[in-house]
Amino acid sequence: EALNYFFKLDFIESNCVKAWRGIGWCSFISLKYEQAMKYYEKIIEHKPLAIDYMNAGHVAWVMGNIQKAAVLYGKAITACGTRERFLEMFHKDEEPLLKQGIREEDIPLMLDLL
């Protein structure tokens, strides 16, 4: 239902980054990874925030593209200003990552890559 709301908002308001963020996240948790990545890439081309890079990293990771995920997470760290702020943000998303099939033991390994 939320996904439909964000699609309507995107239709009404062109280049609505807020709608794209909603579509990206709702698509991610709905297992629509290609759609999620499409919207995160649009955001990154326009006005990305640290969370946009991080969420795009999540999508890349669950799609099996570890290298792309690491690059996007690196950009998120830069946008956050500090690794600590990134980690705080990242740890809030551990549950959704686990629900998407990321193994708990792989999380520290990914963070070590960064």
What kind of feature is each model-predicted range?
Residues C80-L114:
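Terminal, low-structured helical/coil segments at or just beyond the last alpha-helical repeat
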